[in-house]
């Protein structure tokens, strides 16, 4: 009997191709047109998106991207490529492809790349440690659309999330310990996760529970008292309520209350990107210090660290 050949598809959100208003506009249009991201009535949303949001936000967001852009592209793309290459080296007999929900390389190009390698089975690993319908759900939807157009469909194993995976928690804990050793132990470790509208959670998205799971497991691995670890949510968009407490408002409050030293980690981001390097490491640092805080450090994402790559290898091994 012929042995099954397995390929791995690493999936992430995506990024503009360049830090220009035109490239950012193309990316935001695709991203904000996904009903998994914004489920507002199209009759109301299309005029607002095309007539107001894209013209106004694209130039401003392009400047933010330019402030963090790297020689090889956006940070998310650079680190995602490093993850793909490192995992391929770790698993030399297994094809590894990278696909993005929005922008390029697309999920479809990643699937085609694996099919060109004659794989019979694809393990899909969305690089979102905590499930949400707006991220992991978007990968699932697009994958289904892609495969619906194929005459032959490979076997699919879809990893929902890894919020409490032992290797993931240990990698986070070791990263925190290294930061504490370098900068000193802070008064508070703040874990900032990307937010979603509160309505999504009310309708059944278990994302906040998965974030709480990671927070609890990480605090336990570090042996930190509950009052020394706080969970917040960042990057809200629009006017409706999002998951709370909000990261920026919390940092302002903590600075005003006299908390002197904070370190911030974003466990939900598999790779550093605009939201971590600009929003958290820069904007929110200014918020905290401007409110009276004394010392603020951002703990980088796991990116392509050996521990994280080993976690990926172990995670997909159960499905190969």
UniProtKB/Swiss-Prot annotation:
Give the InterPro entries listed for this entry: Ferrochelatase, Ferrochelatase_AS, Ferrochelatase_C, Ferrochelatase_N
Which amino acids does the record list as binding Fe cation? 194, 275
Matches recorded under PROSITE patterns? FERROCHELATASE
Q: Which GO terms describe its molecular function?
A: ferrochelatase activity; metal ion binding
| Reaction catalysis annotation | heme b + 2 H(+) = protoporphyrin IX + Fe(2+)
Q: Which cellular components does GO assign to this protein?
A: cytoplasm
| Keyword annotations | Cytoplasm, Heme biosynthesis, Iron, Lyase, Metal-binding, Porphyrin biosynthesis
- The Enzyme Commission number assigned here is 4.98.1.1
Cite the Gene3D superfamilies for this sequence. Answer: 3.40.50.1400
**Localization of this protein:** Cytoplasm
Q: Which family does it belong to?
A: Belongs to the ferrochelatase family.
Note the subunit structure. Answer: Monomer.
What name does the UniProt record give this protein? Ferrochelatase
Which species expresses this protein natively? Shigella boydii serotype 4 (strain Sb227)
Identify the taxonomic lineage of the organism of origin.
Answer: Bacteria, Pseudomonadati, Pseudomonadota, Gammaproteobacteria, Enterobacterales
